[in-house]
Design a protein with these regions (language model features):
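ATP-dependent carboxylate activation and anion-phosphoryl transfer catalytic cores
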Residues: 12, 18, 24-27, 239-240, ...
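Phosphate-binding site of ATP-dependent enzymes
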Residues: 30-31, 154-155, 162-166, 173-264, ...
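Short glycine-enriched loops at secondary-structure junctions
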Residues: 126-130, 235-237, 285-288
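Short glycine-rich anion-binding loops that position phosphate/pyrophosphate groups of nucleotides
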Residues: 20, 97-100, 172-174, 297
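Conserved N-proximal alpha/beta basic substrate-recognition cap immediately N-terminal to
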Residues: 11, 22-150
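Redox-cofactor binding/interface segments in oxidoreductases and associated redox assembly factors
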Residues: 16, 94-95, 169, 208
Length: 325
């Protein structure tokens, strides 16, 4: 028969599962940056909300809208055609739905996993999204972390606070700096704070030794397939705040990685790659990793702007290599 055309001529299809595109903030949205990079490389973009992904007789399907993207803060997308496809008709899928990391999120990862079994590259790997909870995954790298206790037992949490004198307490399932408190030994509100954060001893809670360097802010470092982008985004807390989240009003500035930052990345990089975590953001305060964000890391656009990078293009370079491997 006739030789088939080389795969190069076939338009690559990218699925993206995300929050509603009309409500993003374009100039700082990493998912938009990724779609713009994919589009520039000739990919066709298929957009899904979590509600659009479904199992039909065990086949993972999706109701899509195709998108055209624009790097424009007033007009950043247009819908094209609407349709339905098997997820395994796509070449790659970006799972960019923000937490909450709840059962609904987990069900969606099972649907994506079925497409993965049929050869679709999912970024990040669905099983690893389930296994590598943002705050708990740091336990794999104790050499990179400050003293930490995870418990929902108020007595244990209180004992840790007494022992370390100055601590940060946060719910394991929080996002964007919500419900993060600094608690010092002897604080008359300690019991009330433990009760609130642990939802009356029903929710696992993380308490960590306070890292004084937080006054210099925290740093977000991005890794693509385990290799760090050589610049970090330092987030300076709003005056009087303990929280270095952009969502909590922090200001940002880019800076090159320090030697210690690079060491931390070298510790975690191989494990991230082995687990199929192709795009990850780690949060660093002082000398320590405080969180490893695998679900929907951001800060691409800020670093691109500050240093003339194109981080999303690097990501797609990596995705395309993986697909042709």
């Amino acid at each position: 028969g006739f030789p088939t055309l080389p795969a190069m001529n076939k338009t690559r299809k990218l699925g993206i599962v995300m929050d509603p595109i009309e409500s993003i903030t374009p100039y700082k949205d990493s998912s938009l940056a990724m779609m713009l990079a994919a589009q520039a490389r000739g990919w066709q973009i298929y957009y899904f909300l979590m509600d659009d992904i479904f199992f039909d007789n065990g086949i993972a399907m999706g109701q899509f809208k195709t998108l055209t993207l624009f790097d424009d803060n007033d007009h950043w997308f247009e819908y094209g055609e609407t349709g339905r496809c098997r997820l395994d008709d796509l070449d790659a899928i970006l799972m960019r739905k923000d937490p909450p990391f709840d059962l609904e999120y987990i069900y969606c990862t099972y649907m994506l996993e079925q497409a993965e079994e049929n050869g679709v590259l999912i970024v990040n790997k669905p099983a690893s999204l389930r296994d590598c909870n943002e705050k708990l995954f740091t336990r794999v790298f104790p050499q990179c972390c400050v003293d930490t206790l995870v418990s929902r037992n108020p007595a244990l949490l209180k004992e840790f606070i007494e022992r370390h004198q100055d601590t940060i307490i946060k719910p394991l399932d929080g996002m964007g700096g919500r419900s993060i408190f600094r608690v010092q030994a002897g604080d008359p509100n300690t019991n009330a704070i433990i009760e609130a954060v642990s939802k009356e001893a029903t929710s696992q809670t993380m308490v960590q030794r306070y890292i004084p360097e937080i006054s210099d802010g925290d740093k977000r470092i991005l890794l693509i397939d385990g290799v760090a982008i050589p610049y970090a985004l330092a987030r300076l807390p709003a005056p009087g705040e303990n929280r270095g989240n952009i969502a909590a009003g922090a200001s940002t500035r880019g800076q090159p990685l320090s030697e210690r930052d690079q060491w931390l990345c070298d510790q975690v990089g191989p494990e991230l790659r082995a687990r199929g975590l192709m795009f990850v953001g780690i949060d660093v305060i002082g000398d320590f990793i405080t969180e490893i964000n695998v679900t929907s890391p951001t800060c691409i656009r800020e670093l691109d702007r500050d240093f003339g990078l194109n981080i999303s293009a690097d990501l797609f370079e990596c995705i395309e290599q993986r697909l042709t491997a």
